[in-house]
A protein has these predicted regions:
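Hydrophobic faces of well-ordered beta-strands that scaffold small-molecule active sites
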Residues: 127-130, 163-165, 190-194, 217, ...
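Active-site mouth loops of central-metabolism enzymes
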Residues: 133-143, 193-199, 256-259
Length: 390
């Protein structure tokens, strides 16, 4: 039996409006090869998750109707805002909003497959939680480290995708170890995000991540600009090309360099042997006046030309946002602020609800609007990119 477009729209609308995640299995390996579009079941609605998150997170985050860098959080770093006047944060939102989807209504797609392969691990959609640290100084300390890891990783795994553990710039090594221990105890599938510390400190943290069974590593190269916030006695620094090569060789795990915003630096990362890059301005939190990631992604993808895995972040809130980034050439995306809010509003169920919401929205966009059977079928003909010329 297949879904007609009308039934698909009705079913997806009901699933998004009605309820949160309920009884999906926590066993990651049991995810189907072609996720179906089904109503979400449970007791908590997405609006309830947002309301609870707002109650918990003010004044760190106000859970605005649109997370666009223009709310009360402007300039709040630490916190949820962007640096300075939050123009980098705003540029992420504006550049993504400016990309438009081309509607295609004559095709034979009925049930799309939103899943992708992420370095040998099948995940339900091209969305992974962004590594996020600072449960105290960024989020207000309303969740313990264990609660936050359980919420992010447990919820993402319930939805069939990967969670994340961060090496926060203001966190001592003990906190990082505690996060990894929680991940290991529960057998969560996740990635780990590291800061550009001294080489020996990064490699030490790589070893700990390997022991915890993580899937891939990222290093936030752009966090070198946040040295003033590093824990006393610890160092973050810019990395040379030779240092990048050393880090790639230091681990057998896939290593992606994050914070790449220009084609030439993408090429440097490839030449250093990186498994991938993450196009990111750190949510506008490291430099106040960067362009938005959607504005630079197409040219970076052109430069990479399939030579490495390309990820991107920047104000992802909906499944249509995911399709836009993938259409511009990203292999996968990272979502940060929205997952953190979902964790505070509903713990693992809230995170799974948000993840499944995005997956359902992506599926609707693929089948009803753009006619893509699988994620690999999403391409640039499906989007209108302002000011872009190949």
């Amino acid at each position: 039996m297949f879904f007609s477009r009308r039934n698909l729209l009705k079913g997806s609308a009901a699933s998004l409006a009605a309820t949160a995640l309920g009884s999906s299995s926590t066993a990651f390996a049991q995810q189907s090869s072609a996720p179906t579009i089904r109503p979400l079941t449970g007791k908590m609605t997405y609006e309830e998750v947002r309301n609870r998150a707002r109650e918990m997170m003010i004044p760190r985050c106000y859970v605005c109707p649109e997370c666009n860098g223009r709310g009360p959080c402007v300039g709040q770093v630490p916190g949820f805002g962007g640096m300075g006047a939050s123009r980098g944060f705003q540029a992420n939102y504006d550049s993504l909003a400016a990309v438009q989807l081309n509607s295609r209504v004559v095709h034979s797609v009925h049930v799309p497959d939103t899943s992708i392969d992420f370095f040998g691990t099948k995940i339900s959609m091209p969305v992974i939680a962004a590594p996020t640290g600072g449960t105290t100084y960024n989020m207000g300390g309303k969740l313990t480290e264990e609660e936050f890891v359980n919420a992010i990783c447990g919820g993402c795994n319930k939805a069939g995708t990967l969670g994340a553990v961060a090496d926060g710039i203001g966190d001592p090594l003990l906190v990082y170890e505690k996060r990894l221990q929680t991940l290991k105890e529960h057998g969560y599938k996740a990635i780990v995000g590291l800061k550009p510390r001294l080489q020996k400190d990064i490699i030490e943290r790589m070893r700990l991540a390997e022991e915890a069974g993580i899937i891939a590593l990222t290093i936030d190269l752009d966090s070198a600009g946040r040295a003033a916030r590093a824990t006393k006695g610890q160092t973050v620094e810019p990395k040379t090309f030779e240092q990048l090569k050393e880090l790639v060789k230091a681990s057998k795990l896939p290593l992606l360099f994050k914070g790449i915003m220009t084609p030439d630096e993408a090429e440097l990362c490839i030449n250093a042997g990186a498994a991938g890059i993450v196009v990111s301005n750190h949510g506008g939190r490291t430099l106040a006046d960067t362009p938005g990631t959607a504005a630079v992604l197409p040219r970076i993808v052109d430069k990479v030309n399939g030579c490495c895995f390309v990820m991107v972040d920047g104000t992802l809130a909906r499944g249509t946002d995911v399709e836009k980034y993938v259409a511009m050439g990203a292999n996968c995306t990272l979502a940060g602020r929205h997952f953190v809010r979902a964790a505070h509003g509903g713990l693992a169920d809230g995170v799974a609800l948000f993840a499944n919401k995005m997956k359902n929205e992506l599926a609707v966009a693929m089948v009803v609007l753009t006619g893509a059977q699988a994620v690999k079928d999403i391409n640039r003909s499906m989007v209108v990119i302002p000011d872009y010329k190949a």
